[in-house]
Structures are given as structure tokens and as C-alpha cells.
Amino acid sequence: VHWTAEEKQLITGLWGKVNVADCGAEALARLLIVYPWTQRFFSSFGNLSSPTAILGNPMVRAHGKKVLTSFGDAVKNLDNIKNTFAQLSELHCDKLHVDPENFRLLGDILIIVLAAHFAKDFTPDCQAAWQKLVRVVAHALARKYH
């Protein structure tokens, strides 16, 4: 994947403002609420019976932070995303059996969360760069499935 200097700047500039704990928790909670079938991968998280329960669930919050922290590794390694996510791809494919479509769904939700939190900074050019990034990350995570 080729990144222009402008794309890199738009991605890293916005990433520097992201509260990983809050945005990660919100993104994962939205995934579980909007796409309830994804909850089956989180049965050990306890009460996911309603949006209120999901939003208040400390395990959702903690895992959301973990997910977005990993996403930060992509931002730091834009030129080597495939290798950055090789182990996570293996884990999600071989051990967790996560449908790779869920990576795309989470990427789309992350775009929504970023747009909501950073409306002024989230210009169409910024969105295009981030859309490219979430697509590349989703592809890297799905790599072991092929």
C-alpha cells in the first residue's frame, strides 16, 4: 500500500488527538449494539443484554481500549501493516474463528466514532485517508483466512 505524505499527516495528526480508552470503548460498544451477532465472540464478557449494559460493561471498555491500542500500531507502522497484524490475524482466524467481515464492520464504526469526536478535523480528505487505513487493517487481519 502506498501512502502519500498528506495521507500520513492526516492519519497521524488525528490519531494524536484520539483518547484510545474512550474511542475504543465506544467503537466496540457500537459494534456489539449495532451488529448484535458479534456478541457471540464476547460471551465471557458477562451482561451484554442491552445497549445500557454494553455501554457500562467494564470488559467491553477494556477490550475496546486494547483493540484501539492495536490499531495505533497500524498508525505507527503504516508501511508495514501486514506484518504488524500477522499474529493478531492468526489468533482471530485459528483460535477465535472471527468472521473477517467483522473487521470491516469495526473499521466502519471507527470512522463514525472519529467523525463524531473530531467533526471539525474530520474533513473529506481526512475521512478518505482513514477509510483507506481501516480497509488496509481489515485486510491484514483477514489475511490468515485465505
Swiss-Prot record:
Keyword Heme carried by entry: yes
Chloroplast found in the keyword field: no
Binding residue positions for heme b: 63, 92
InterPro entries recorded: Globin, Globin-like_sf, Globin/Proto, Hemoglobin_b, Hemoglobin_oxygen_transport
Domain spans labelled Globin: 2-146
Disulfide bonds, paired cysteine numbers: none
GO BP annotations, alphabetical order: hydrogen peroxide catabolic process
Keyword annotations of the record: Heme, Iron, Metal-binding, Oxygen transport, Transport
Classification via Pfam families: Globin
Tissue: Red blood cells.
Gene3D superfamilies: Globins (1.10.490.10)
GO cellular component, one term: haptoglobin-hemoglobin complex
A GO MF term: metal ion binding
Family to which the UniProt record says this protein belongs: Belongs to the globin family.
Subunit structure and binding partners: Heterotetramer of two alpha chains and two beta chains.
Functional description taken from the UniProt entry: Involved in oxygen transport from the lung to the various peripheral tissues.
Protein name: Hemoglobin subunit beta
Organism, as annotated: Branta canadensis (Canada goose)
